[in-house]
């Protein structure tokens, strides 16, 4: 059992860990091809984690912020704009190969923006929500988010409007289709 802040923080930690790994200087030894294969896997993992996380925030977190926080509408709008932009970049990243200049440039931009987005949520939004949310509702929201993550889409879907309700209606199907595509992509790469 964990409340909404604990659940989201765990996700943020995981995303930050993956981004730190991607920024590490390559260690000597491993051959270039192997290194690029690893990098591709790390990016794939980042896309999966980030897609699931933002999808469940859209479905459950932002509606709660809008509902409970006095300036919630504005806070949510700003954050969702950042999330949408990130989805377009991630969607493009799927088609590029690591090592290619364009890929590395897009990834670098994504990482900067993602850190900014995470800081915005943790520093601007969470403190406001903490002031007004009851412990019961925080737990309930955490549980819902954890459950929804199991079926959430693992790809960014930038063309789907970031509205709550869509995930409830289409999420399990989109999530399942994404997982099949992830598997196929993983197999063809070996
Ligand atoms: Fe977010
Ligand atoms: Fe987040």
Model-derived segments and spans:
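Small-residue-biased structural context
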Residues: 1-190
